[in-house]
């Protein structure tokens, strides 16, 4: 397979170590780079000041979704795949300039051990998109759509830029929203 934008290519591995079951995900990292998703996240989201960056959080959640993750706990599946973690480390090192890598290192109080965030920081991150004041306006038994807060509006801008990229290359007049019809008992 030809090499894309990011510094990886697919090769047959003779050893057992470094093998990944998530070999298709780096192609999506390549697509995210071409689409400028990272830059869009950096431009519109300013939630994290320490530790994991907004870009790392959002891309981790996107990759989790693409890998078939059902919940935040499934981030452990990404972290537990040694081959995938090696690819992520290499991509992170290659796409950042030296100054950016140093700034990233300074965000951490302790040395970073993981490639993908654990569930606790992700839950705290996701909580930033929720406005508890809006919940006070909820009426029991009625549908309720809260007014988006600053962070959710930023995420909406990231989503708009992703759609603009796609629309710019393959214009469509109709968009279909596919919903899973699976019944879940509550």
Protein language model regions, located:
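Dynamic "connector" segments at or just before major functional cores
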Residues: 1-186
């Amino acid at each position: 397979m030809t090499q894309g934008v990011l510094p990886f290519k697919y090769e047959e591995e003779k050893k057992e170590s470094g093998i990944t079951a998530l070999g298709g995900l780096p192609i999506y990292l390549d697509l995210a780079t071409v689409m400028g998703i990272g830059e869009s996240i950096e431009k519109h989201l300013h939630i994290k000041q320490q530790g994991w960056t907004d870009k790392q959080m959002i891309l981790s959640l996107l990759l989790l979704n693409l890998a078939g993750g059902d919940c935040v706990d499934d981030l452990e599946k990404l972290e537990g795949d040694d081959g995938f973690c090696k690819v992520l480390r290499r991509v992170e090192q290659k796409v950042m300039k030296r100054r950016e890598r140093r700034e990233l290192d300074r965000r951490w109080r302790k040395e970073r051990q993981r490639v993908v965030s654990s569930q606790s920081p992700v839950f705290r991150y996701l909580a930033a998109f929720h406005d508890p004041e809006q919940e006070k306006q909820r009426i029991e038994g009625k549908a309720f759509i809260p007014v988006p807060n600053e962070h959710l509006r930023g995420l909406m801008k990231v989503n708009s830029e992703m759609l603009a990229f796609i629309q710019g290359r393959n214009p469509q007049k109709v968009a279909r929203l596919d919903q899973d019809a699976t019944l879940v008992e509550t």
